């Protein structure tokens, strides 16, 4: 159930996200599943001899649209709606959807009819292949007992994944620090955070609290206490959940008679098998270990100089990294992340991001006025900017009806093709932290495109930005997630199943990682001035220092990514062990060692959900991303290249394998040269 709205004096009928109550979530979910069952039954009733692409593939596309029209909106409301009752209803609905989808892809009658299709186009051929693989990965070809066990496991994994994410999202733990423990923190941060009756600072774990604290608090004991609390926010329950998830995944591998869950998963990805992943991680390890040790040595020098500790005793702990890296950046590159917020005011940065995207991809974003409905906004705090320094991107003030949103801080934009004004789709931006909201930054492809059905896309950007301005790191994150949004809303695929980010898991991060580079180039950053007349001028000398400061610490950063990826693969291996035991052992083998009393696996939402045996994909995709940047040459704002990227990569979704799309864009095979140079800080 996706709402549509035609505005007065506006000929566009746009799809919108319905703002549902808890009762409506249940009703919408039930009705959608009932209608989908009827549509699937019609497909199953087609005689094998009468099968065509129209009565099977096209009919499936229409059934998939019914499902997504309901569960796309439910999925985003489940993660961001201010009312807990709606989020809880979303948990139940998404579990029901997952169970339905497993049943659907275990239907032998449906499977037989898909196999009987004779495709007449490349898109039909790819959809037929994708559907057959989805059936086979859901157990349709397994013996009945194994098929039923797969169904039970799949349902349980969905329940566990939902509970894991909920435990992190709704953990309201706060830590209290004395004013002395907060020495070094910027005054705007101190003015913003709440205090208890004794005047102590009360800090949660949202990004706007966490990042400044770990970068600036001079008290090492305070940083350690915050680091431990943040690392343990997943609770002991999540450790038990993850161990059960790992065991169930291994059982799936056993049902398919393959050595490991990694074998079961990677066969559908660019790497094709876990051996390729391990070789890739080994190559990263051979390059990154020395770089990480070198970076830590430089931080030790800073710690020794600042604290008076002898260099051989100035060991860097995990709660030291961000603090001393910032001091090194200040000393060596004259870069102060907190001071950078004046260059990147939050609202102006969002406007700049939209402007850059317009120029690159030949689109236009038109902001519409919005109206929050269906939630008690008076009891929901949200860290919005106190002032608006942006020069444009104000909402329209004509007689068009406001767009309904779930919170009064949420923005909505129509997306138009700049060449002819054609309406392409819509995007929602939910930018600021609040209680109960998803804690990280992510994009939701709420509504995928289907040119076959005349369907337009909707994407949602969810972040937890500091309302008073962004650091350079936060600007990169904003661009990264908006890269996912663009991948969704600029998709132009024939079938819904191929739309947007529905690509191989180890490719999905590449377009968004590529977009991060626009945060570090003069030709793009110079445009910030057009969106904030009061901001300091960004000059080439500053950009050069930003780039140098960003490159420092690459060994530490990629060393951590390597640890995450290797940990994920170990949990998906032939003989998985308890997650805490594995983590203690693997983190303990790194240069900084394991921090006793911490349980990071309980917060690792990626591997509790769709990224299992897939976290390596962040680095694998980075190889592709940095190579694709090379196609822009010396000018990242080259609109001709940007529109080629839109046409050859973003618009195609998964209508072709990712490798073929990338090689078509580059005109050659992918090279890892730029990636390994980045690891070395070059």
Q: For the regions a protein language model found, what residue spans apply to each?
A:
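C-terminal, non-catalytic "cap/extension" segments appended to globular domains
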Residues: 2-27, 31, 200, 348, ...
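Short, basic, low-complexity termini and linkers enriched in Ser/Thr/Gly/Pro
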Residues: 302-306, 370-388, 392-403
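Short, hydrophobic/amphipathic alpha-helical patches that form generic packing surfaces
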Residues: 65-76, 133, 228, 321-327, ...
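Short pre-active-site segment immediately N-terminal to the catalytic Zn-binding motif
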Residues: 465-479
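N-terminal helix-rich structural modules
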Residues: 2-185
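Active-site-proximal, well-structured secondary-structure segments within enzyme catalytic domains
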Residues: 123, 127-129, 156-159, 166, ...
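Alpha-helix capping and helix-loop boundary segments enriched in small/acidic/polar residues
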Residues: 236, 272, 344, 469-473, ...
């Amino acid at each position: 159930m996706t709402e549509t709205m035609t505005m007065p004096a506006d000929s566009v009928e746009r799809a919108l996200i319905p703002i549902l109550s808890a009762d409506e979530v249940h009703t919408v979910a039930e009705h959608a599943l009932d209608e989908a069952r009827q549509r699937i039954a019609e497909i199953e009733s087609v005689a094998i001899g009468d099968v065509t692409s129209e009565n099977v593939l096209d009919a499936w596309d229409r059934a998939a649209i019914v499902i997504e029209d309901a569960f796309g909106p439910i999925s985003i409301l489940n993660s961001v709606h201010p009312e807990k009752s709606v989020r809880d209803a979303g948990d139940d609905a998404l579990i029901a959807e997952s169970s339905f989808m497993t049943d659907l892809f275990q239907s032998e009658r449906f499977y037989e009819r898909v196999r009987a299709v004779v495709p007449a186009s490349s898109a039909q051929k790819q959809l037929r292949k994708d559907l057959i693989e989805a059936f086979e990965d859901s157990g349709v070809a397994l013996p009945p007992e194994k098929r039923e066990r797969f169904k039970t496991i799949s349902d349980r994994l969905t329940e566990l994944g939902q509970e894991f994410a909920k435990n992190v999202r709704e953990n309201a733990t706060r830590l209290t620090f004395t004013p002395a423990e907060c020495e070094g923190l910027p005054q705007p941060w101190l003015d913003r955070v709440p205090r208890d009756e004794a005047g102590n600072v009360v800090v949660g774990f949202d990004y706007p609290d966490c990042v400044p604290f770990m970068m600036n608090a001079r008290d090492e004991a305070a940083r350690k206490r915050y680091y431990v609390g943040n690392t343990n926010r997943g609770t002991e329950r999540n450790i038990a959940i993850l161990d059960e998830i790992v065991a169930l995944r291994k059982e799936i591998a056993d049902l398919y008679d393959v050595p490991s869950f990694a074998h079961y998963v990677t066969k559908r990805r660019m790497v094709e098998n876990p051996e390729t992943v391990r070789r890739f991680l080994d190559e990263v390890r051979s390059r990154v270990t020395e770089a990480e040790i070198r970076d830590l040595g430089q931080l030790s020098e800073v710690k020794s100089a600042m604290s008076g500790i002898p260099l051989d005793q100035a060991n860097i702990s995990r709660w030291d990294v961000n603090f001393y890296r910032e001091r090194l950046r200040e000393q060596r590159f004259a870069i102060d992340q907190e001071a950078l917020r004046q260059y990147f005011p939050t609202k102006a940065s969002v406007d700049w991001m939209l402007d850059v995207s317009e120029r690159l991809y030949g689109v236009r974003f038109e902001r519409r006025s919005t109206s929050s409905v269906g939630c008690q906004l008076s009891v929901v705090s949200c860290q919005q900017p106190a002032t608006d320094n942006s020069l444009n991107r104000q909402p329209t003030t004509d007689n068009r009806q406001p767009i309904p949103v779930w919170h009064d801080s949420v923005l909505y934009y129509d997306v138009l093709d700049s060449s002819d004004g054609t309406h392409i789709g819509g995007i929602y931006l939910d930018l600021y932290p609040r209680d109960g909201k998803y804690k990280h930054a992510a994009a939701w492809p709420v509504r995928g495109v289907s040119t076959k059905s005349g369907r337009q896309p909707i994407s949602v950007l969810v972040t937890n930005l500091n309302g008073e301005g962004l650091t350079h790191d936060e600007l990169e994150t904003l661009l990264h997630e908006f890269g996912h949004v663009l991948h969704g809303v600029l998709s132009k695929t024939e079938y819904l199943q191929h739309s947007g980010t529905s690509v191989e898991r180890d490719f999905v991060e590449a377009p968004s990682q590529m977009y991060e580079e626009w945060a570090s180039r003069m030709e793009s950053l110079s445009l910030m001035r057009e969106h904030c007349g009061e901001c300091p001028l960004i000059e080439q000398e500053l950009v050069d220092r930003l780039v140098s400061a960003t490159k420092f610490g690459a060994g530490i950063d990629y060393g951590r990514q390597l640890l995450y990826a290797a940990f994920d693969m170990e949990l998906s291996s032939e003989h998985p062990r308890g997650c805490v035991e594995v983590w203690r052992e693997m983190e303990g083998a790194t240069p900084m060692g394991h921090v006793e009393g911490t349980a990071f696996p309980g917060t690792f939402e990626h591997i509790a959900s769709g990224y299992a045996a897939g976290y390596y994909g962040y680095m694998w995709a980075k190889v592709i991303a940095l190579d694709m940047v090379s196609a822009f040459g010396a000018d990242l704002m080259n609109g001709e290249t940007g529109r080629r990227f839109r046409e050859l990569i973003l618009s195609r979704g998964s209508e072709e394998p990712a490798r073929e799309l990338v090689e078509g864009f580059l005109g050659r095979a992918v090279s890892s040269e730029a990636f390994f140079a980045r690891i070395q800080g070059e």
